[in-house]
């Protein structure tokens, strides 16, 4: 059985799955949830991720990081990044043109790249899988929005490396969802399936034809910056204005109030998918003022109507690109939590002349499900279900080079099936030109200045010749991850240069990745040390209380003389008082303190045992002692329930 997993690293929530014994298992985290918030938080003492990080967001807004996926692989001056920064409670700084996240961690100012934050979320998913599978997990297939560009894909791959994963493949989210939908549907002839994937932060539409286990993507389109969070933002702004109207106060400057309001808005949005109205009740939201209000589904739909409508543009685009009429679409599959919104479902259904979307797959889990199937295939774990499965994905954006006059000359048009390789011959622009600059762009516009520069390289040493004579063959090669290699050869001399488009400016260098990997390991060790410290503290605390309880038992008073009794009770009380004052002591200090208490206890408890055992005590042990081992012995649980 292979231990490869599929990870859907979402903008707001992530999910991990594993394929074994002919079925996919979605793996629940330590809280029992099948999806985990893509949150990382930094405090004075520790680093938190997942549910633990999200749950303390209101108390620690400046150091709780989320939405790394909206920053990954982008430039700092990207208008969308600038728009997001206005909403973020944490600080985003410009480091050589890239956005980085600045937080306070253990009393120091730290700066992290979006890749590092994403890697922490991926590490959390990796650990979730490891505790379920009972073994280390190295191999993973990670999904990205279909409309992610080259640098966003590379950055996602880097995040996986930093998390200590071997990223076997980067696959597109809608394609993964299509596998989840089509895995059990074998013999229905060719089906055109439209995947409508509206998640927490990104939106994709892909049109596939599925036939006999072959999943061929015909076209893809989307918006890497549209999702449930944008709907939350509309609600948050609506309620900020309402609060202003009612109380003449603006809560915009108070991050804690904004976080509490946002959490309430997320909840309200979810409720409005199943009821027509919901109320928000937030006690003491701002300056002691309670905020009680309500919102109807109709009002919510009106607040977001332009966003909802804009989801249909990519649908029209994929139909046009795939040269299909809407009547030729056999199934519409909804993926992503935001497709639970009734208005979104209705818009899609109306667009397809009343055709009902297919709801046979879980919108939150479908992407991880498909990624797990792909991971199993790549590790050679063939079962009857997967052996005939073939994925043919496409490049989402056209790729080309700049030619004279700033013209974009496309070598690979968008929606070309990948992996693919394409060569074209170019020449020099002026007489005796000694070299050419090859600039690689992605995008759909006619002029390169309107497209995205991926990278450039120089091919020099061309022998002097009139313009148009030298033959320079440029080859574009896209691998299965959608990542591009470009090479150029001067035919006369055989001189060649090549570049893996790793986004010169944007991509992390090998050294940086190695540094981040070792830092990630260091943080992990610190996290484990902190967990050990907490266990020692809790162990000492419950031990001290259980001994103290013994002192109040009747037998104790009867069998132990008063002076010993008082000394022992004082030792227990002193330990408890010491614990209150030393919340941040080391594991060793807690263990030493425990040994002192054990010695004091041994003296007194000998008298008790001599008289023939103690009720409630384990044979040969102190009452309650089995339940709170020190960190050196690991028998028994180290957790106690607090009412």
UniProtKB/Swiss-Prot annotation:
Gene Ontology MF term list: ATP binding; ATP-dependent protein folding chaperone
Localization terms from the record? Cytoplasm
> Where does the record place Gly residues bias?
613-627
Q: Please give the InterPro entries that the UniProt record associates with this protein.
A: ATPase_NBD, Heat_shock_70_CS, HSP70_C_sf, HSP70_peptide-bd_sf, Hsp_70_fam
Task: Give UniProt keywords alphabetically.
Answer: Acetylation, ATP-binding, Chaperone, Cytoplasm, Nucleotide-binding, Stress response
> Which stretches does the entry tag as region Disordered?
609-643
Instruction: State the SUPFAM superfamilies in the record.
Output: Actin-like ATPase domain, Heat shock protein 70kD (HSP70), C-terminal subdomain, Heat shock protein 70kD (HSP70), peptide-binding domain
- The source's domain of life comes to Eukaryota
User: Any idea what job this protein has?
Assistant: Acts as a chaperone.
The name this protein goes by in its record: Heat shock protein 70 2
Q: Provide the gene name from the record.
A: HSA2
């Amino acid at each position: 059985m292979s231990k490869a997993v599929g990870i859907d690293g979402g903008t707001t929530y992530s999910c991990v799955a594993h394929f074994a014994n002919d079925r996919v298992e979605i793996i629940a985290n330590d809280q029992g949830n099948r999806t985990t918030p893509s949150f990382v938080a930094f405090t004075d003492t520790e680093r938190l991720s997942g549910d633990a990080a999200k749950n303390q967001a209101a108390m620690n807004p400046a150091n709780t990081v989320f939405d790394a996926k909206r920053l990954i692989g982008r430039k700092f001056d990207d208008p969308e990044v600038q728009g997001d920064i206005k909403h973020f409670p944490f600080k985003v700084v410009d480091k050589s043109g890239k956005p980085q996240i600045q937080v306070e961690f253990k009393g120091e100012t730290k700066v992290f790249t979006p890749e590092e934050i994403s890697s922490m979320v991926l590490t959390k998913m990796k650990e979730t899988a490891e505790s379920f599978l009972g073994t280390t997990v190295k191999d993973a297939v990670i999904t990205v929005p279909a409309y992610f560009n080259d640098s966003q894909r590379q950055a996602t791959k880097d995040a996986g490396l930093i998390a200590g994963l071997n990223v076997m493949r980067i696959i597109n989210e809608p394609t993964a969802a299509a596998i989840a939908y089509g895995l059990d549907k074998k013999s229905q002839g060719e089906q055109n399936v439209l995947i409508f994937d509206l998640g927490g932060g990104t939106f994709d539409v892909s049109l596939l034809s599925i036939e006999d286990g072959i999943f061929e993507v015909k076209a893809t389109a989307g918006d890497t910056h549209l999702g449930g969070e944008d709907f939350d933002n509309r609600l948050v702004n609506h309620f900020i204005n309402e609060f202003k109207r009612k109380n003449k106060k603006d809560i915009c400057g108070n991050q804690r109030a904004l976080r509490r309001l946002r959490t309430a808005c997320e909840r309200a949005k979810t409720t409005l998918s199943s009821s027509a109205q919901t109320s928000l009740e937030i006690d003491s939201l701002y300056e002691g003022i309670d905020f009680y209000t309500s919102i109807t589904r109709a009002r919510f739909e009106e607040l977001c109507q332009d966003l909802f409508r804009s989801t249909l543009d990519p649908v029209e685009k994929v139909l046009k690109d795939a040269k299909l009429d809407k009547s030729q679409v056999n199934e519409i599959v909804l993926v992503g939590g935001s497709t639970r919104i009734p208005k979104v479902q209705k818009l899609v259904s109306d667009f397809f002349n009343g055709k009902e979307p297919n709801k046979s797959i879980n919108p939150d889990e479908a992407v991880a499900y498909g990624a797990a199937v792909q991971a199993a295939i790549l590790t050679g774990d063939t079962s009857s279900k997967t052996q005939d499965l073939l994925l043919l994905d496409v490049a989402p954006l056209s790729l080309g080079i700049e030619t004279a006059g700033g013209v974009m000359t496309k070598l690979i048009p968008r929606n070309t099936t990948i992996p693919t390789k394409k060569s074209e011959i170019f020449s020099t622009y002026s007489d005796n030109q000694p070299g050419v600059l090859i600039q690689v762009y992605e995008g759909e516009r006619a002029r390169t200045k309107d497209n995205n520069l991926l990278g450039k390289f120089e091919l020099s040493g061309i022998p002097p010749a009139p313009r148009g004579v030298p033959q320079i063959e440029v080859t574009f090669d896209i691998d299965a991850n959608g990542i591009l290699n470009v090479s150029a050869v001067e035919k006369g001399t055989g001189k060649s240069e090549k570049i893996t488009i790793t986004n010169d400016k944007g991509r992390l260098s090998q050294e940086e990745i190695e540094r981040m990997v070792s830092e990630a390991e260091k943080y992990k060790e610190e996290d484990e040390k902190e967990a050990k410290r907490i266990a020692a503290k809790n162990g000492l605390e419950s031990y001290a209380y259980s001994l103290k309880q013994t002192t109040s038992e009747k037998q104790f008073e009867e069998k132990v003389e008063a002076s010993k009794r008082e000394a022992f009770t004082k030792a227990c009380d002193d330990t408890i008082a010491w614990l209150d004052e030393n919340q941040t002591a080391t594991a060793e200090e807690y263990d030493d303190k425990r040994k002192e208490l054990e010695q004091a206890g041994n003296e007194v408890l000998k008298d008790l045992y001599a008289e023939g055992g103690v009720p409630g005590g384990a044979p040969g042990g102190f009452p309650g002692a089995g339940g709170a081992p020190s960190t050196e012995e690991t028998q028994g649980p180290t957790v106690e329930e607090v009412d």
